[in-house]
């Protein structure tokens, strides 16, 4: 593990990669609404949502946040062979721009910190969810991950 830790520490401050584009369909939004019991009209009622400044339905902020996990796994990161990785939490989560239905998003990941903890390592990563064709990101968060060996 020490070799992996040193290799990752050398990458601190670097962007590690970008995920593929993910389409945010109304079906995905509706499924998230069902799973979380969050049926606010701006997410699930296209007719009412069309009358808002958004001009249509938008993804839940927490859907965008939830998708950051599988998107991050698309970005190659050589962490050796941990027994498991766990979500340790988040810091400074913001949703600067809404994600309109049928738009595409992707994740950009930067490694901010790496440190040793008992049995493993702790990483702090900045994750930025971009919306295709827009400058303002959908989400910016500091993601905390623990790997145990």
Describe the residue ranges of each PLM region:
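Hydrophobic beta-strand-centered segment that forms part of the acyl-chain substrate-binding groove
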Residues: 52-56, 69-108
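A solvent-exposed, acidic/Ser-Thr-rich amphipathic alpha-helical stretch
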Residues: 60-64, 68
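A generic structural signal for short beta-strands and their flanking turns/coil linkers
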Residues: 18-20, 28, 38, 82-91, ...
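Catalytic strand-loop segment that frames the active site of acyl-thioester-processing enzymes
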Residues: 1-59
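A generic structural signal for residues embedded in beta-strands
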Residues: 18, 66, 107-109
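HotDog/MaoC-like acyl-thioester-processing domains
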Residues: 2-11, 99-149
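Generic structural detector for well-ordered beta-strands
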Residues: 17, 21-23, 94, 144-146
């Amino acid at each position: 593990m020490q070799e992996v830790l040193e290799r990752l520490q050398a990458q601190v401050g670097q962007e590690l990669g970008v995920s593929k584009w993910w389409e945010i369909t109304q079906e995905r939004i509706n499924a998230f609404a069902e799973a979380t019991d969050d049926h606010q009209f701006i997410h699930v009622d296209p007719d009412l949502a069309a009358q808002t400044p958004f001009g249509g339905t938008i993804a839940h902020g927490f859907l965008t946040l939830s998708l950051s996990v599988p998107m991050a796994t698309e970005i190659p990161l050589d962490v050796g062979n941990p027994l498991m990785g766990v979500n340790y939490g988040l810091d400074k989560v913001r949703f600067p721009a809404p994600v309109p239905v049928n738009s595409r998003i992707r994740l950009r990941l930067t490694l901010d910190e790496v440190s040793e903890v008992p049995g493993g390592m702790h990483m702090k990563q900045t994750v930025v969810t971009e919306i295709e064709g827009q400058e303002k990101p959908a989400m910016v968060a500091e993601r905390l991950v623990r790997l145990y060996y």
